[in-house]
Amino acid sequence: MTAQHQSDTLLHRLNTLPPKRYGVFLLNDDYTTMEFVVEILTEIFMLGQEQAVAVMLLVHHEGKGLCGTYTRDIAQTKQQQVMQRAKAEGHPLQCIVEEI
């Protein structure tokens, strides 16, 4: 195998790596209702009711819960949707994005 062929093969592999994944997390607070968190999880993250309740309980008991993993742009959009909805409805709910 020539050096040029090895270089081309490596470049091809680098160009075809999957995009990085980012987790969108909700953070617990003492004021946001559990019902609102479940609403966010079902309407923005499209979780089923049972899964939404499980994530909400994780947020409540552990302080942080993963809502889903996405590419960076989608994760940031989901975060903005959560923050806008929480603000509009008077909840201090916080949402963060972290590279997974």
Curated annotation (Swiss-Prot):
Job description of the protein: Involved in the modulation of the specificity of the ClpAP-mediated ATP-dependent protein degradation.
Protein name: ATP-dependent Clp protease adapter protein ClpS
Record NCBIfam families: PRK00033.1-5
Family matches, as PANTHER family: ATP-DEPENDENT CLP PROTEASE ADAPTER PROTEIN CLPS, ATP-DEPENDENT CLP PROTEASE ADAPTER PROTEIN CLPS1, CHLOROPLASTIC
Subunit structure: Binds to the N-terminal domain of the chaperone ClpA.
InterPro entries (UniProt xref): ClpS (IPR022935), ClpS_core (IPR003769), Ribosomal_bL12_C/ClpS-like (IPR014719)
One GO process term, biological-process aspect: proteolysis
Family listed: Belongs to the ClpS family.
